[in-house]
Amino acid sequence: MGSIIDAAAAADPVVLMETAFRKAVKSRQIPGAVIMARDCSGNLNYTRCFGARTVRRDECNQLPPLQVDTPCRLASATKLLTTIMALQCMERGLVDLDETVDRLLPDLSAMPVLEGFDDAGNARLRERRGKITLRHLLTHTSGLSYVFLHPLLREYMAQGHLQSAEKFGIQSRLAPPAVNDPGAEWIYGANLDWAGKLVERATGLDLEQYLQENICAPLGITDMTFKLQQRPDMLARRADQTHRNSADGRLRYDDSVYFRADGEECFGGQGVFSGPGSYMKVLHSLLKRDGLLLQPQTVDLMFQPALEPRLEEQMNQHMDASPHINYGGPMPMVLRRSFGLGGIIALEDLDGENWRRKGSLTFGGGPNIVWQIDPKAGLCTLAFFQLEPWNDPVCRDLTRTFEHAIYAQYQQG
């Protein structure tokens, strides 16, 4: 990948960057990508599409192109949408950030904490100490984790206590016990799935209907849904999921369950499908603080570090010790970070004025989707791949190169 990016060093950075993407497609390092950038003033409206939406050829032996309106799996990029929906409920007085979720999520409140296993291998469960709040859910400090990330939960599943996620019912995602008390540590987990349930119970609407009425309608979005199988217009032109073989680096079609069946309910942490252009509308609305989704003061709240110093330090230690996960995507691993309401906040500039600035908010999704909103620079960017696993080095390097090029162009005016 380095030879693609470093071949010519002194030309126009955007031209070089686009050349890198084209070469990556031509050499079959990626099937395709969509990259987008917008600014507050409307002077920058950048979109480029590269390559194909699948590695499978169609009946004409062609690879259909990946386009700005191609329906794609957002995976964890869904979490930003669910955060927005939960904050809308807060604005409307339906929930409070710091009240216990007991009223709306008694099933979560009753969930025990898995402490470990005794000498006979039996699970040791105890009552939770403290109450979970919406703020805990939005900042991943509730004590919940994902099975695939936590050794205690993996053992718990291996003993037959949990259904496989292949069942694709939300209760199989929400069934694992907590692994710590609320506020005890930052742990990445199924918090936004529970936040989605909170929105449903607070409003009386399922999350799909709420999404359509409160995010899609205000922004004029028609290709964003939890229910892909109910949208034949989107199914006909959706992207495939592609997987890179770890042994030889080759790309292969991934017959993922997520594309074959809708969830029994809506997964607020991972369940939405959307065209890249529609997702950019959400990012741009937040950047402009235009009031279409959230009041400006609520948007400002999203960008405020939400962790106390102890949790912030623990989160940084965890992230620095997890380069294989690399929650921050193209962000340098040594960067100081916090967590806001919706994503990771940079506590320092990434590279002076040449890249993301202090206070920028970022997150992404498993198919190597990376979004970021940078209020100080007045920019938002979106890199959209449909290639797993997450933290793919080719996608990561291309995303970093894209962002650097956009910042360089924008600084030049």
UniProtKB/Swiss-Prot annotation:
2-methylbutanoate binds at residue 366. Changing residue 383 to V: Strongly increases simvastatin synthase activity upon overexpression in E.coli and abolishes activity with LovD-bound alpha-methylbutanoate. Changing residue 275 to S: Strongly increases simvastatin synthase activity upon overexpression in E.coli. Changing residue 275 to S: Strongly increases simvastatin synthase activity upon overexpression in E.coli and abolishes activity with LovD-bound alpha-methylbutanoate. One of its GO terms (molecular function) is hydrolase activity. Changing residue 190 to T: Strongly increases simvastatin synthase activity upon overexpression in E.coli. Changing residue 161 to Y: Strongly increases simvastatin synthase activity upon overexpression in E.coli. It comes from the Eukaryota. The active site is at residue 76. Changing residue 192 to I: Strongly increases simvastatin synthase activity upon overexpression in E.coli and abolishes activity with LovD-bound alpha-methylbutanoate. It catalyses: monacolin J carboxylate + (S)-2-methylbutanoyl-[2-methylbutanoate polyketide synthase] = lovastatin carboxylate + holo-[2-methylbutanoate polyketide synthase]. Changing residue 172 to N: Strongly increases simvastatin synthase activity upon overexpression in E.coli and abolishes activity with LovD-bound alpha-methylbutanoate. Belongs to the class-A beta-lactamase family. Monacolin J acid methylbutanoyltransferase; part of the gene cluster that mediates the biosynthesis of lovastatin (also known as mevinolin, mevacor or monacolin K), a hypolipidemic inhibitor of (3S)-hydroxymethylglutaryl-coenzyme A (HMG-CoA) reductase (HMGR). The first step in the biosynthesis of lovastatin is the production of dihydromonacolin L acid by the lovastatin nonaketide synthase lovB and the trans-acting enoyl reductase lovC via condensation of one acetyl-CoA unit and 8 malonyl-CoA units. Dihydromonacolin L acid is released from lovB by the thioesterase lovG. Interacts with LovF. This is Monacolin J acid methylbutanoyltransferase. It comes from Aspergillus terreus. The lineage of its organism: Eukaryota, Fungi, Dikarya, Ascomycota, Pezizomycotina. The gene is lovD.
